[in-house]
Amino acid sequence: MSYTIPAQTRTEIGKGSSRRLRREGKVPAVIYGVGKEPVSIVFDHKDIINIQANDDFYTSVLTIVLDGKEVNVRAQAMQRHVFKPMIDHVDFVYA
């Protein structure tokens, strides 16, 4: 199954800006890989919370629509809130 996640490039980086994004219902993330510059992104929490419950989310290639351009990635790591059903941060790797 293929998954598509709309995202935007993130310009503000750091703990304070990430906390502000989480309060707004967004998830900060990063895309990195060999030979490419890392890209900080942000997407809506509602766009990922349901699809990450599927097992194939972690093994299949995902499509992130980043500012109108499609980028193929794989989920590398996901940080979750300790007791709330929320995702704090996601690391993606270029596929």
UniProtKB/Swiss-Prot annotation:
UniProt xrefs under Pfam families: Ribosomal_L25p (PF01386)
Source superkingdom: Bacteria
Any single biological process term in GO: translation
Bridged cysteine pairs (disulfide): none
GO function terms (MF aspect): 5S rRNA binding; structural constituent of ribosome
Presence of keyword Repressor: no
Signal sequence residues: none
Claim: RNA-binding is one of the keywords in the record: yes
Single GO cellular component term: cytosolic large ribosomal subunit
SUPFAM superfamilies: Ribosomal protein L25-like
Keywords: Ribonucleoprotein, Ribosomal protein, RNA-binding, rRNA-binding
Function: This is one of the proteins that binds to the 5S RNA in the ribosome where it forms part of the central protuberance.
SUBUNIT field: Part of the 50S ribosomal subunit; part of the 5S rRNA/L5/L18/L25 subcomplex. Contacts the 5S rRNA. Binds to the 5S rRNA independently of L5 and L18.
NCBIfam families membership: bL25_bact_ctc, PRK05943.1
Protein family membership: Belongs to the bacterial ribosomal protein bL25 family.
Protein name: Large ribosomal subunit protein bL25
Species per Swiss-Prot/TrEMBL record: Shewanella amazonensis (strain ATCC BAA-1098 / SB2B)
